[in-house]
Design a protein with these regions (language model features):
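Glycine-rich adenosine-cofactor-binding loop
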Residues: 8-18, 24, 151-171
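NAD(P)-binding Rossmann-fold cofactor-contacting core
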Residues: 27-42, 174-194
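Rossmann-fold NAD(P)-binding glycine/threonine-rich loop
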Residues: 101-118, 241-285
Length: 289
């Protein structure tokens, strides 16, 4: 039975959800949470004693992005063991669920039960806003991982999707040269019309040796052994594509190349900014309903 004591109920989450809670409380909403712990969490947020209490206490449920990393547990900043299937079984037709990167099995269940839901990471405007934190975090990671400046360097971005585009435009003001190599002819054309240098994907191996920084956004193996062999010894390779990424990491380590799969950046970098645009979209959707 839904009691609906609070405007919002947060289940699990990271720093983005902590800042979302604080902002919502600051503008007068009531909030309860379960599995969300941090010293800066506003003490007006009421901690639920159980998952069941959290779910039945609010019609609007906010979950993490991604909701789960292993498909079994809801991601949490606490040590609580929050089972995804237990959470789903507590939902009713009166609930509306927000979160990100919902599993196909979860969306199928919600649709079958007629429960309203919204996956933030299926919303174009949020994906674009998210690309800001992703690109800035990627640049920060590159800077602290390298022995040289971005200034006067040569950078290559593999792919030219949303995150790659934002990253490319930010790098342009920092690097001597930013080139794009994309498998898609449309993406290559988009890079060219944005005045970036373009490298044909089938010419990657013969051109790779000039780059100081390589950023991969393609979620399949593109940085093969053959290509890695031709990279500079001091190259920094940052892979922000979905796991397992697009780099042969074991071989990169074997030959002494720095390569790192760097994921979940908006949860690590500028979470307060991410929380602001998530709340903006959330409240807009609530008002519509």
């Amino acid at each position: 039975m839904l009691i609906n004591k609070y405007d919002f109920s947060f289940v699990g989450g990271d720093m983005r959800q902590v800042y979302m809670v604080n902002e919502l409380l600051a503008i007068g909403y009531s909030v309860t949470s379960y599995g969300l712990e941090n010293p800066i969490l506003d003490n007006r947020c009421i901690a639920a004693s159980s998952l069941k209490e959290a779910v039945i206490s609010g019609k609007t449920i906010i979950t993490p992005i991604p909701i789960s990393k292993d498909g079994i547990h809801i991601q949490s900043s606490s040590s609580m063991d929050i089972k995804l299937d237990e959470f789903l079984n507590l939902l009713t037709l009166s609930h509306q669920v927000f979160g990100g990167c919902f599993l196909p099995s979860m969306t199928s269940y919600l649709m079958e039960k007629g429960i309203s839901y919204e996956d933030f990471m299926e919303v174009e405007e949020i994906i674009l806003y998210n690309s800001i934190a992703t690109s800035e975090g990627t640049i920060a990671k590159a800077i602290i991982s390298s022995t040289i400046n971005l200034h006067d360097s040569h950078a290559l971005i593999l792919g030219f999707g949303r995150c790659a585009r934002t990253l490319a435009h930010k790098l342009r003001s920092l690097c001597k040269e930013v080139d794009i190599s994309a498998r898609s002819r449309v993406q290559s054309a988009a890079a060219y019309t944005s005045s970036f240098g373009t490298i044909p994907f089938d010419k990657l191996e013969e051109n790779i040796s000039k780059y100081d920084f390589i950023f991969n956004t393609i979620p399949s193996l593109v940085m093969t052994k053959e290509i890695l062999d031709r990279t500079k010894e001091q190259v920094v390779i940052i892979d922000i594509a979905s796991a397992p990424g697009g780099v042969d990491f074991s071989y990169a380590k074997e030959i002494g190349r720095y390569a790192e799969l760097y994921l979940g950046i908006p949860g690590k970098i500028s979470p307060k900014s991410s929380a602001t645009f998530l709340n903006h979209y959330l409240l807009e959707q609530i008002r519509k309903k």
